């Protein structure tokens, strides 16, 4: 579960390395974001000559959470850390590569571009 002030790794090559959630989109009092949800992030750490700079405020899709993800068949999936992919205003990823596995729950949330770029879908 991602909430305000949560630090996340960036799972793409947009130039950001670490981001901090500053807002969970989808309702005035919405507190938590899960896999596939869109959040507003502030870039806390970035590489030189990247597409995004430190201090930029961008939208991002949560692709991995450390909290258990319950599936309909009763199975549970869990990741080692929290990660997000930075997106533009058209909900397309800013980077051209995705690093690490992503869950198939992203497919149900219509983030097909992220699923197709990912090296592994769990």
Curated annotation (Swiss-Prot):
Matching CDD domains: Ribosomal_uL14
Signal sequence, renumbered to the chain: none
One GO BP annotation of this record: translation
GO MF: large ribosomal subunit rRNA binding; structural constituent of ribosome
Pfam families attached to this UniProt entry: Ribosomal_L14 (PF00238)
Gene3D superfamilies linked: Ribosomal protein L14 (2.40.150.20)
Record keyword Heme present: no
Keywords recorded for this protein, A-Z: Ribonucleoprotein, Ribosomal protein, RNA-binding, rRNA-binding
UniProt cross-references to InterPro entries, sorted A to Z: Ribosomal_uL14, Ribosomal_uL14_bac-type, Ribosomal_uL14_CS, Ribosomal_uL14_sf
Record keyword Repeat present: no
A GO term from the CC aspect: cytosolic large ribosomal subunit
Subunit architecture: Part of the 50S ribosomal subunit. Forms a cluster with proteins L3 and L19. In the 70S ribosome, L14 and L19 interact and together make contacts with the 16S rRNA in bridges B5 and B8.
Family: Belongs to the universal ribosomal protein uL14 family.
Function description: Binds to 23S rRNA. Forms part of two intersubunit bridges in the 70S ribosome.
Name of this protein: Large ribosomal subunit protein uL14
Taxonomic lineage of the native organism: Bacteria, Pseudomonadati, Pseudomonadota, Alphaproteobacteria, Maricaulales
Gene field: rplN
């Amino acid at each position: 579960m991602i909430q305000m002030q949560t630090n996340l790794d960036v799972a793409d090559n947009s130039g950001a390395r670490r981001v901090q959630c500053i807002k969970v989109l989808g309702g005035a009092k919405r507190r938590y974001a899960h896999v596939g949800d869109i959040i507003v992030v502030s870039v806390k750490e970035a590489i030189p000559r990247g597409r995004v700079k430190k201090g930029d405020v961008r939208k991002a899709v949560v692709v991995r959470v450390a909290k258990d993800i319950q599936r309909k068949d009763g199975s549970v999936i869990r990741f080692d850390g929290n990660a997000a992919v930075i997106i533009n205003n058209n909900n397309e990823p800013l980077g051209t590569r995705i690093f690490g596995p992503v869950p198939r729950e992203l497919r149900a949330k219509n983030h097909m571009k992220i699923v197709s770029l990912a090296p592994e879908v769990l």
